[in-house]
């Protein structure tokens, strides 16, 4: 059985609706995806270029010369985890910014860098809602990782409770808080 396709005018209208609702993090200056191919993405984090696996990249175009500029590549291990293959010397950690926020970046043993830059669209959404609320806002950020959403909400004026089970990630969030100049009061439930 086949369904008739909607007329061209209706398809165009649907596309326009999607475009109006699609959020794009257009304030990045220190992060960009340079290219993608064969299960990998080539990313620029400040002045450092990394190749990381991405299972959603299923197309296989030829990798151009820009891939030769990579400073490091994360290689998965068949036993789980993986490691970074270093092509060029780069810092162990460095700082990037998004709008008025600053973040420590450091490639980890599980392919992450300490930040999910695609979440910036959500940070912008939160900031807009908090800034236009017309009342004090309190936010509970669970599984808060290194604090991107926490810092965005705090920068917009919210009172934020940042929660993550990993002490290492909470410590990293504190570093990001200091880099961004946000005042956060911290405590650890395990210490009380």
For each feature predicted by the language model, list its residue ranges.
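Conserved SAM-binding loop of SAM-dependent methyltransferases across substrates and taxa
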Residues: 146-157
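Conserved alpha-helix/loop element of class I SAM-dependent methyltransferases that forms part
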Residues: 118-132
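Conserved SAM-binding loop
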Residues: 173-174
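Non-catalytic substrate-recognition/targeting regions of SAM-dependent transferases
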Residues: 29-43, 50-117, 124
């Amino acid at each position: 059985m086949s369904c008739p396709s909607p007329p061209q005018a209706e398809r165009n209208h649907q596309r326009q609706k999607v475009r109006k609702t699609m959020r794009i993090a257009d304030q990045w200056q220190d992060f960009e995806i340079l290219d993608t191919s064969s299960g990998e993405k080539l990313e620029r984090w400040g002045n450092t270029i990394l190749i990381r696996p991405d299972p959603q990249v299923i197309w296989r175009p030829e990798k151009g010369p820009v891939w030769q500029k990579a400073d490091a590549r994360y290689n998965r291990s068949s036993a789980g985890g993986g490691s970074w293959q270093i092509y060029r010397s780069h810092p162990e950690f460095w700082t990037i910014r998004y709008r008025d926020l600053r973040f420590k970046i450091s490639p980890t043993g599980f392919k992450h860098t300490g930040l999910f830059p695609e979440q910036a669209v959500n940070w912008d959404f939160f900031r807009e809602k908090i800034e236009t609320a017309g009342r004090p806002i309190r936010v509970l950020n669970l599984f808060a990782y290194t604090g991107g959403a926490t810092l965005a909400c705090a920068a917009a004026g919210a009172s934020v409770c940042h929660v993550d089970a990993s002490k290492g990630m909470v410590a990293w969030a504190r570093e990001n808080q200091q880099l961004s100049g946000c005042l956060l009061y911290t405590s650890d439930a395990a210490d009380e």
